[in-house]
Amino acid sequence: MGDIQSKLVSGLQLWQWRHQAIKTADATDVPPAEVDWLLGEVAGLDRLALRLESFKDWPEIELQLPLEDLEQLWQRRLHERLPVQYIVGVTPWRHFKIAVSSAVLIPRPETESLIDLALAATASSQTTPPLQQGHWADLGTGSGAIALGLAKIFPQAIIHAVDYSSEALAIASLNANNLQLTDRIRFVQGSWWEPLASLKGQFSGMVSNPPYIPTSTLPTLQPEVFHHEPHLALDGGADGLDCIRHLIEISPTYLRPGGVWLIEMMAGQADIVQELLQNQGCYYNIQIHPDLAGIERFALAYKS
């Protein structure tokens, strides 16, 4: 009972906390909208209640944690630049609510386009059996976001989600479980294609958001990213292309003829990636696609 009691606050108390938090957010260059997102998660308040401040008159609101703990986490957001997604433990992505921790990269909105591109790539292909079926790989799955997206658009496919980090795979498995997709996604620990060697030549497609940031660029990233997100998922080596080169080189062995090769990359890498794909000699119909901001962000090709 005491535990529940410590998590109960009056609407007025929470209203006062919210106003103070918004003020401190403004003062420290944190988007004030994060306050309401946080309260939506920990207090179950919807956007309307927050916008109209109708909760101010409620006699009591049960939080997921005591108000003092919430304040401590908010101070970490302000002063340690801890991402709000790690504070609440979830982030929205496509139609999902995805669990995240500091063991995984926070899935970005632009990465959602990989799923749309995969769908379009299979729709325009005349390959038999259809590319929407069979085996698909999400290499470097992290939170499992891409694997979940693929499982949703390809209900007849088996998705193999690979990651080097066992902690990341635990989060990805949790997400698949929460979304009732565990029967369609197989989680495998290992490096890129290695643990899938028994399925060489059988994959309808491979999708990856690999590490693509040059090592020397990492310290220039936002503190939220540099200090809190896993460098294993960010560091792409001297020119940022180590992992992408590997995926270009190795993937033809695993893809079936006509199979899809699709990755996300950094702004400014498109020309080199396109050239690497052409020079490899095992790909055709090589395409570069922009993200929603018009930046050349995705490379798509088919196995010859």
Locate the predicted segments by residue.
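Non-catalytic accessory regions of SAM-dependent methyltransferases
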Residues: M1-K56
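Conserved SAM/SAH cofactor-binding pocket of Class I
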Residues: S113-T220
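Conserved AdoMet
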Residues: E41-A121
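Residue-level signal for inorganic ion chemistry
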Residues: L38, R81, T111, I146, ...
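Conserved Class I SAM-dependent methyltransferase catalytic core
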Residues: A238-Y302
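Conserved hydrophobic residues forming the short capping helix/wall of the S-adenosyl-L-methionine
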Residues: A25, T122, A176, S251, ...
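Mobile active-site "lid"/loop adjacent to the S-adenosyl-L-methionine
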Residues: Y212-C243
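Short helix-capping segments at alpha-helix termini
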Residues: D29, P155-Q156, N177-T182, Y254, ...
